[in-house]
């Protein structure tokens, strides 16, 4: 997936509207960009006042087979009555192409922001995650990757080594902190967990609330442990996180089994996300949208803070993992 140098500068509004017109959709409103840096996503209304979202995928990030697997997973979830935003089919195809771009069209789904501190909402999310994972366990992804150390740690480490935008005065300390963190994660990482198809990026921003949860954006769907779709929902101090996790697991287990031994993967997964996110920003720096929206990435203070964050996360990895109350 060598997509580092790509930009969306050739994706003009006329190109988008032509692509939609090819599918029989006439745009009757403007194209409203939605918050997405990795892809380009727009909301619009057609002549019949129906609202849609069109998503143009970043070329070469995912293969055609990988995107189709994501779409198939979404459609399976809908069939199993799991509330997800799934792509629409045109002439039997959900993945469409126009002028070198692949794209998909979704119904526009409104909703309020999921309230991460609302225990009732957290319980409902836990129940539906159990159902989502029931579907995910039916078979693994064939083309999409597994969550693992190579993609999330070792490849990003090389990105840091090669990155010219990390200030020279901070690079040595940052790389040292990175290496220490990588060693700590490697020591406590496990591969004996049950693998299933995951949402992959299940945080509060990817859940809408409409008399219940609605999961959106399966772009990061992968194979991995169930805990990956739970830990990003936790917030606050350890006591608050314990209560939230117990709420999620209790609701989850109404419909699906959960291996509580996976709780020990929360902090390694958090460390992997920290490392991967920084490498992602560096890889995308050639896209003009990134320097514009992340101007602080070249600053000394920013990298000093990241070094401190990595050191603190290493300390957390050496502490006992989050513990549930004895009933679990």
From Swiss-Prot:
Nucleotide-binding listed as a keyword: yes
Site feature location: ATP: 36
Catalytic EC class: transferase
Required co-factors: Mg(2+)
One GO CC term on file: cytoplasm
Catalytic residues identified in the record: 201 (proton acceptor), 217
Gene from which this protein is expressed: srkA
Keywords: ATP-binding, Cytoplasm, Kinase, Magnesium, Metal-binding, Nucleotide-binding, Phosphoprotein, Serine/threonine-protein kinase, Stress response, Transferase
Residue positions binding Mg(2+): 206, 217
EC number: 2.7.11.1
PANTHER family: STRESS RESPONSE KINASE A
Function, as annotated: A protein kinase that phosphorylates Ser and Thr residues. Probably acts to suppress the effects of stress linked to accumulation of reactive oxygen species. Probably involved in the extracytoplasmic stress response.
Protein name per its UniProtKB record: Stress response kinase A
GO molecular function: ATP binding; magnesium ion binding; protein serine kinase activity; protein serine/threonine kinase activity
Species assigned in the record: Salmonella paratyphi A (strain ATCC 9150 / SARB42)
UniProt subunit comment: Monomer.
Taxonomic lineage from the root: Bacteria, Pseudomonadati, Pseudomonadota, Gammaproteobacteria, Enterobacterales
Family designation: Belongs to the SrkA/RdoA protein kinase family.
Lineage top rank: taxon: Bacteria
Subcellular location per the Swiss-Prot or TrEMBL entry: Cytoplasm
InterPro entries given in the database record: Aminoglycoside_PTrfase (IPR002575), Kinase-like_dom_sf (IPR011009), SrkA/RdoA (IPR032882)
């Amino acid at each position: 997936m060598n997509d580092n140098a790509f930009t969306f500068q050739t994706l003009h509004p006329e190109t988008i509207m032509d692509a939609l017109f090819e599918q029989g959709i006439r745009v009757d409103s403007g194209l409203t960009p939605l918050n997405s840096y990795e892809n380009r996503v727009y909301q619009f209304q057609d002549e019949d006042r129906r609202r849609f979202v069109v998503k143009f995928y970043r070329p070469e990030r995912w293969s055609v087979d990988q995107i189709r697997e994501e779409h198939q997973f979404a459609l399976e979830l809908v069939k199993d009555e799991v509330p997800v935003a799934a792509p629409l089919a045109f002439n039997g195809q959900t993945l469409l192409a126009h002028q070198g771009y692949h794209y998909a069209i979704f119904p526009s789904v409104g909703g309020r922001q999921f309230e991460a501190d609302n225990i009732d909402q957290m319980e409902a999310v836990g129940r539906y995650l159990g159902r989502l994972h029931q579907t995910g366990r039916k078979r693994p992804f064939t083309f999409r990757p597994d969550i693992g150390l190579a993609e999330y740690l070792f490849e990003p480490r090389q990105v840091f080594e090669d990155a010219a935008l990390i200030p020279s005065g901070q690079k040595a300390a940052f790389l040292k902190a990175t290496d220490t963190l990588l060693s700590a994660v490697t020591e406590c990482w496990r591969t004996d967990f049950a693998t299933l198809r995951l949402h992959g990026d299940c945080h509060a921003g990817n859940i809408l609330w409409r008399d219940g949860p609605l999961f959106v954006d399966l772009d990061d769907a992968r194979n991995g442990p169930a805990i990956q779709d739970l830990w990003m929902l936790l917030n606050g101090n350890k006591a608050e996180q314990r209560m939230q996790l117990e709420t999620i697991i209790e609701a989850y287990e109404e419909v699906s089994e959960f291996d509580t031994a996976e709780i020990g993967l929360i902090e390694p997964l958090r460390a992997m996300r920290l490392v991967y996110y920084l490498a992602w920003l560096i890889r995308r720096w050639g896209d003009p949208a990134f320097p514009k929206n992340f101007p602080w990435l070249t600053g000394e203070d920013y990298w000093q803070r990241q070094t401190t964050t990595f050191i603190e996360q290493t300390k957390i990895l050496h502490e006992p993992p989050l513990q549930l109350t004895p009933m679990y």
